[in-house]
């Protein structure tokens, strides 16, 4: 999932090496470095209008922690400190650090008292209804979020959601995201989009939120930002959030940071990746290869052991009737030197965005063979 431009991409490697030979990095707390500044500007050029201010950290989990801190602090600066609730969807995944992991479990279910307070998970999309109604029109399941906002809206700091859930590869319907955006606006809460997995081309668009034609208040990206070559994450905020922090003179901006935040060599990698995505026709090719992959793998759709195939760009999930079936398919592919991800009873495809057509066809052929073998067991 990380190697979005494959291995040993010379444009990215050369950019990293060139930066290492000049200055590996420089502290961002009281200073800065040119690659970080340039990358922040470059991100502002490809995100939705208003998303112009970026804070760099080192991983998706750190990005989640940062976004939560920004959201809560924003409301406190506006003397709205009762807004502390962070709302997420059940069965989500946002990372393994303290607040990030609590998003997936909620404070209420913490019987041992180990997790921080103020986190609530609500039921998400009704996936069975989404299957029946179709991804393009469904917003089934939004009722649970509407009820929670109606009951607790004045206490909600932010709602955080992945446009495509990393666990299982479930695509959150565009209408659901639009309704969530409207709820956040209506009740004065922030919409935080976790695009750690989907950001920078994975779905065939630069960002997955483009499918729903919405703009988040905070956007978190990581994996595709450097294509896995260096550890880097970005929290990009809307101007309206930045302006509140800038007006608070005693804060001197956003008081937050890590030793390697905005690492210059990592940001150099990010600049090279963005250049490739924008100038080498990658996104258009992802759309074309997505069609090929979906049609090829779709040959197993009528197999009795296959429950559903979900695909957006070069991110595909094939759901089987059991975890054991998925394990068997993964082992068969590994035995044939194909590395693939399994999540529960789902097999997840996330090949490099610049993969060759021949490799896509080979991957699909080997997968169909694995399905035939596993289905006969």
Where are each of the predicted segments found?
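Conserved N-terminal phosphate-binding loop of PLP-dependent enzymes in the Aspartate aminotransferase
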Residues: 1-377
């Amino acid at each position: 999932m990380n190697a979005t431009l494959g291995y040993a991409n010379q444009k990215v490697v050369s950019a990293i090496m060139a930066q290492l030979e000049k200055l590996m990095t420089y502290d961002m707390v009281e200073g800065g470095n040119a690659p970080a500044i340039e990358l922040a500007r470059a991100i502002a050029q490809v995100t939705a209008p208003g998303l112009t201010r970026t804070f760099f950290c080192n991983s998706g989990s750190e990005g989640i922690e940062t976004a939560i801190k920004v959201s809560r602090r924003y409301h406190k600066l506006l003397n709205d400190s009762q807004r502390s609730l962070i709302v997420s969807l059940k069965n989500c995944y946002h990372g393994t650090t303290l607040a990030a992991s609590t998003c997936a479990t909620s404070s209420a279910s913490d019987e041992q008292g180990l997790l921080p307070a103020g986190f609530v998970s609500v039921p998400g999309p009704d996936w069975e209804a989404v299957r029946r109604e179709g991804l393009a029109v469904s917003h089934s399941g939004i009722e649970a979020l509407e009820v929670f906002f109606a009951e607790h809206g004045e206490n909600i700091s932010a709602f955080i959601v992945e446009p495509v859930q990393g666990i299982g590869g479930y695509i959150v319907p565009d209408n659901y995201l639009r309704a969530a955006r409207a709820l956040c606006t209506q009740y004065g809460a922030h919409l935080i989009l976790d695009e750690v997995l989907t950001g920078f081309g994975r779905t065939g668009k630069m960002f997955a939120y483009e499918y729903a034609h919405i703009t988040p208040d905070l956007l978190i990206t990581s994996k595709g930002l450097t294509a896995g070559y260096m550890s880097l994450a970005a929290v990009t905020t809307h101007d309206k959030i930045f302006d509140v922090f800038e007006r608070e003179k005693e804060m001197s901006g956003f008081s937050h940071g890590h030793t390697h935040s905005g690492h210059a060599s990592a940001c150099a990698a990010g600049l090279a990746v963005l250049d490739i995505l924008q100038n080498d026709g990658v996104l258009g090719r992802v759309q074309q290869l997505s069609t090929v992959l979906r049609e090829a793998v779709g040959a197993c759709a009528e197999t009795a052991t296959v429950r559903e195939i979900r695909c957006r760009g070069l991110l595909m999930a094939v759901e089987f009737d059991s975890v054991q079936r998925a394990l068997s398919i993964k082992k068969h592919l590994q035995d044939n030197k194909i590395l693939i991800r399994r999540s529960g009873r789902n097999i997840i495809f996330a090949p490099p965005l610049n993969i060759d057509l021949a490799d896509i066809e080979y991957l699909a052929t080997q997968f169909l063979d694995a399905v035939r073998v596993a289905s006969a067991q």
